[in-house]
């Protein structure tokens, strides 16, 4: 499938082409077929370098072109969060009828960053999302799309319980956000989904 065939606004497709994307890889095509652009929650288990970040980007572009809510990208690591933030920040130049604002917050877990409520795409560590939920950040109710990277860590004895808890709380939001779970190494994808 070609980028030009996707059900996305022209500015989004132009952005993807400018970033060097013209065709989808099989995991991306499978995600589209599973309802990625239609608001369906999906689990993507695909090898490293198979285009999981593009899957996240496609979901974000689709969501932001149709909705006013917030997108949250969850990462287990600050370094990965910083890397993805710099990639997603490029989307700020896409004219989708509104100015897209991207922000990252991975620091102090006992504070609520008051500027996050003005952002459309928010990149967080799992622990920061947990802190924001516990401290009652009002914008959490506006989340419409959650992308959880490295979802296989849900089985980790140290980090798994936090990830499981925040995903459960996010699923229960009144806005019923679409959840895209990404992993390169998950072994029980059918059971987890």
Q: Positions of the model-derived regions?
A:
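Conserved ASCE P-loop NTPase core motifs with emphasis on AAA+ ATPases
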Residues: 1-15
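Conserved P-loop/Walker A NTP-binding site and adjacent catalytic elements of P-loop NTPases
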Residues: 13-15, 19-193
């Amino acid at each position: 499938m070609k980028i030009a065939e996707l059900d996305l606004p022209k500015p989004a497709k132009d952005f993807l082409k400018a970033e060097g994307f013209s065709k989808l890889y099989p995991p991306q095509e499978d995600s589209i077929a599973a309802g990625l652009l239609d608001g369906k929650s999906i689990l993507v288990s695909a090898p490293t370098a198979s285009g999981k970040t593009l899957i996240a980007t496609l979901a974000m572009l689709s969501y932001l072109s149709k909705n006013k809510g917030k997108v949250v990208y969850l990462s287990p690591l600050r370094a990965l969060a910083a890397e993805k933030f710099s990639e997603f920040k490029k989307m700020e130049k896409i004219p989708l009828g509104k100015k897209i604002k991207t922000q990252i917050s991975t620091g102090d877990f006992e504070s609520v960053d008051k500027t996050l409520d003005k952002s459309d795409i928010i990149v967080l560590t799992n622990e920061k999302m947990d802190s924001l939920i516990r401290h009652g950040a009002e914008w959490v109710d506006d989340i419409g799309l959650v992308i959880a990277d490295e979802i296989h860590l849900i089985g980790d004895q140290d980090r798994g319980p936090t990830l499981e808890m925040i995903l459960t709380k996010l699923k229960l939001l009144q806005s019923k956000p679409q959840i895209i779970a990404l992993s390169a190494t998950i072994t029980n994808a059918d059971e987890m989904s």
